[in-house]
């Protein structure tokens, strides 16, 4: 089916320029690259861009620690990031930086338009100030107790337990992450973006189909709780762009970071000497399509602030946000101590890029689900699918064609109906690539690979080759197998760029989507060379060990949980005695509708029942498994009203968060209501 060529601009979230690219980052860049490569195969005009997010307090402070300038640090990180992405064959048309003249000009332009249109408000605020470092503390540089659910060790912008958002000044017992000092309050004039003015527009945009259902539902929660004005300024010292006519005030990193998409595209247009395309893609009534691939952790900024900023400054809004989940390794959060926090560069020292591209692709869908990289399953799947099913199909047939027929394929198809079955699948597979149902596309392709190998097994060319007078049959069978291999590799071309190059060299032709409608007949192929090597668990073991060694080399004197979560200040025995810890029996456990973090627990204290909301859902995806288990709870914690009901206590758990949360249990014999002493 002939498609009308579209103009498409695709972006990935901008990696922060203070650390290396790891396998968590690579999920998004691989997902976007597969989609982009498919769009290009279908004849669409695609501009695929990215940049480093190069501003903010963390970069300023890390550069100070390294004894270099922020500019030097972000320059080195940019080179490292680009090398990693090139190693994974991410086909960016441009990779830039938010610390660029294009981004400065666009940030100032958008800010000036927002101000002219009345969407920038000035007001004096009280904020936390580190007296030891002599600096105001951004929200992520303050930790304390959540003012909503009272969970300790939460950042100054949102609680990872209950999901509440708040200002750093609302934290209970705040501490500076920079120095550990107790902050003091100081007044400062700040600039705010009037986000509530865009509530009606954002709600209409949410319902327009521009967002996945899960994202739209989450946005509805934010609308119900009310949108707040957004502080877009930061005080010196700060590494970023100074706000025009406001000495000592800088744009908050999240203002100029998404503008970095525009800055990178502007840089690309300038490199091409193209003064038209930028406006063509970004003007208010643009007919070009704009897609952002992002992780679920930055949905808030991309689904609320970014479209509102664009609307208020007379630019177009995104066509769609494509949101994905996190990466776990072997069923758990990536861990430096276990060697599963794997950098992109470390991976490439042990495996090729196509292997990870294939594994991620086989697991991805259009939903916001986390992806688990199970390293044993990875080895089995790559060997079973790429080596045994696809590459082996070519190797089983190529030898006979090269040796017996001088590399020339038969002039007719041995089984036209089977070939039609393969080409007819283009519509289903293409739709799966288009809709980002990548796992479905891979399943369809592997089902075809099974059919192709079954055909070869049934025709047994190795037997035919020994029978006199059957040369024509042998050529026809092997040519059929090679033609089926060609179709499979065409469907896999968006996923496996390096294997595709080797396949095209063997087939002596470029693989194109429409080209499969015409089989290779009477065509000369090149001598067959090994296309792909099997992988084994020894490589995995070496990869994990190398990742551990990298951590050891970079480790500070303090390692383990205490490094990230130091012991709190000493308290008196009288303070501790105020906490009444009791054994409780979990009578019921269930999901909380409207929350992806909480479970509702019904607890028996041996004489009364308690209803407790606990942020442990990520570690206990099957709440029924908790029923009948004993745990420890804080029984005298004041009840707190939540959106879902009243929580009458807190259960005790350990761990860094995510899937690594471990509910505490007493020894056998403890009864509900027993006091923990």
Swiss-Prot record:
It is found in: Cytoplasm. Binds 1 zinc ion per subunit. Its cofactor is Zn(2+). GO terms for biological process: methionyl-tRNA aminoacylation. Gene3D superfamilies: HUPs, Isoleucyl-tRNA Synthetase, Domain 1, Methionyl-tRNA synthetase, Zn-domain, Nucleic acid-binding proteins. Keywords: Aminoacyl-tRNA synthetase, ATP-binding, Cytoplasm, Ligase, Metal-binding, Nucleotide-binding, Protein biosynthesis, RNA-binding, tRNA-binding, Zinc. ATP binds at residue 336. Residues 575-677 form the tRNA-binding domain. Its EC number is 6.1.1.10. Transmembrane segments: none annotated. GO terms for cellular component: cytosol. Zn(2+) binds at residues 146, 149, 159, 162. It catalyses: tRNA(Met) + L-methionine + ATP = L-methionyl-tRNA(Met) + AMP + diphosphate. A motif ('HIGH' region) lies at residues 15-25. One of its GO terms (molecular function) is ATP binding. InterPro entries: aa-tRNA-synth_I_CS, Anticodon_Met, Met-tRNA-synth_bsu_C, Met-tRNA_ligase_1, Met-tRNA_synth, Methionyl/Leucyl_tRNA_Synth, MetRS_core, MetRS_Zn. Homodimer. Belongs to the class-I aminoacyl-tRNA synthetase family. MetG type 1 subfamily. Is required not only for elongation of protein synthesis but also for the initiation of all mRNA translation through initiator tRNA(fMet) aminoacylation. This is Methionine--tRNA ligase.
């Amino acid at each position: 089916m002939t498609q009308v060529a579209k103009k498409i601009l695709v972006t990935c979230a901008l990696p922060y320029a203070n650390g290396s690219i790891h396998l968590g980052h690579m999920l998004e860049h691989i997902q976007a690259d597969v989609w982009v490569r498919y769009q290009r195969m279908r004849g669409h005009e695609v501009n695929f861009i990215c940049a480093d997010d190069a501003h903010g307090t963390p970069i300023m402070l890390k550069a100070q620690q390294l004894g270099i300038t922020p500019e030097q640090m972000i320059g080195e990180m940019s080179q490292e990031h680009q090398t990693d992405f090139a190693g994974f064959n991410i086909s960016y048309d441009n990779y830039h930086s938010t610390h660029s003249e294009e981004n400065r000009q666009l940030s100032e332009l958008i800010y000036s338009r927002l101000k002219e249109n009345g969407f920038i408000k000035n007001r004096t605020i009280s904020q936390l100030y580190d007296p030891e470092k002599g600096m105001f503390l951004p929200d992520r540089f303050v930790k304390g107790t959540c003012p909503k659910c009272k969970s300790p060790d939460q950042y100054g912008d949102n609680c990872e337990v209950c999901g509440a958002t708040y200002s750093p000044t609302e934290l209970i017992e705040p501490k500076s992450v920079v120095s550990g000092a107790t902050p003091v309050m100081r007044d400062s004039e700040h600039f705010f973006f009037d986000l509530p003015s865009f509530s009606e527009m954002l709600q209409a945009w949410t319902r327009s189909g521009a967002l996945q259902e899960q994202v739209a539902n989450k946005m509805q929660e934010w609308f119900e709780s009310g949108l707040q004005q957004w502080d877009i300024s930061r005080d010196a010292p700060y590494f970023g762009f100074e706000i025009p006519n406001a000495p000592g005030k800088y744009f908050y990193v999240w203002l100029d970071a998404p503008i970095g998409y525009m800055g990178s595209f502007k840089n690309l247009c300038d490199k091409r000497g193209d003064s038209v395309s930028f406006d063509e893609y970004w003007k208010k009534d643009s007919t070009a399509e704009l897609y952002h691939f992002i992780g679920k952790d930055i949905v808030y900024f991309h689904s609320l602030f970014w479209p509102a900023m664009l609307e208020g400054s007379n630019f177009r809004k995104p066509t769609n946000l494509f949101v994905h989940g996190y990466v776990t390794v072997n069923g758990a959060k990536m861990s430096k101590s276990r060697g599963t926090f794997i950098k992109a560069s470390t991976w490439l020292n042990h495996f090729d890029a196509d292997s990870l591209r294939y594994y991620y692709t086989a697991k991805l869908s259009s939903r916001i689900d986390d992806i688990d990289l199970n390293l044993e399953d990875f080895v089995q799947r790559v060997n079973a699918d790429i080596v045994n099913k696809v590459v082996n199909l070519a190797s089983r047939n190529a030898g006979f064609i090269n040796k017996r027929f001088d590399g020339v394929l038969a002039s007719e198809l041995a089984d036209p109906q089977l070939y039609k079955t393969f080409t007819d699948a283009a519509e289903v597979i293409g739709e799966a690539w288009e809709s980002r149902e990548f796992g479905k596309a891979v399943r369809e392709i592997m089902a075809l690979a099974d059919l192709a190998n079954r055909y070869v097994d049934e025709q047994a060319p190795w037997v035919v080759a020994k029978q006199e007078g059957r040369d024509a049959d042998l050529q026809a069978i092997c040519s059929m197998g090679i033609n089926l291999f060609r179709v499979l590799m065409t469907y896999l071309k968006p996923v496996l760029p390096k294997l595709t190059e080797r396949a095209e060299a063997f087939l002596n032709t470029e693989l194109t989507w429409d080209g499969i409608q015409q089989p290779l007949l009477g065509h000369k192929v090149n001598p067959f060379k090994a296309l792909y090597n099997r992988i084994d668990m020894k490589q995995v073991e070496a990869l994990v060990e190398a990742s551990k060694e990298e951590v050891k080399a970079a480790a500070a004197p303090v390692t383990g949980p205490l490094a990230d979560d130091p012991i709190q200040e000493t308290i008196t025995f009288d303070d501790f005695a105020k906490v009444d810890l009791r054994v409780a029996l979990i009578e019921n456990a269930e999901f909380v509708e409207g929350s992806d973090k909480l479970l509702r627990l019904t607890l028996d204290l041996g004489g009364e029942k308690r209803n407790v909301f606990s942020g442990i859902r990520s570690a206990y995806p099957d709440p029924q498994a908790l029923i009948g288990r004993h745990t420890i709870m804080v029984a005298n914690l004041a009840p707190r009203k939540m959106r879902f009901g009243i929580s009458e206590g807190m259960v005790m758990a350990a761990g860094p968060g995510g899937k690594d949360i471990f509910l505490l249990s007493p020894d056998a014999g403890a009864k509900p209501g027993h006091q923990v002493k």
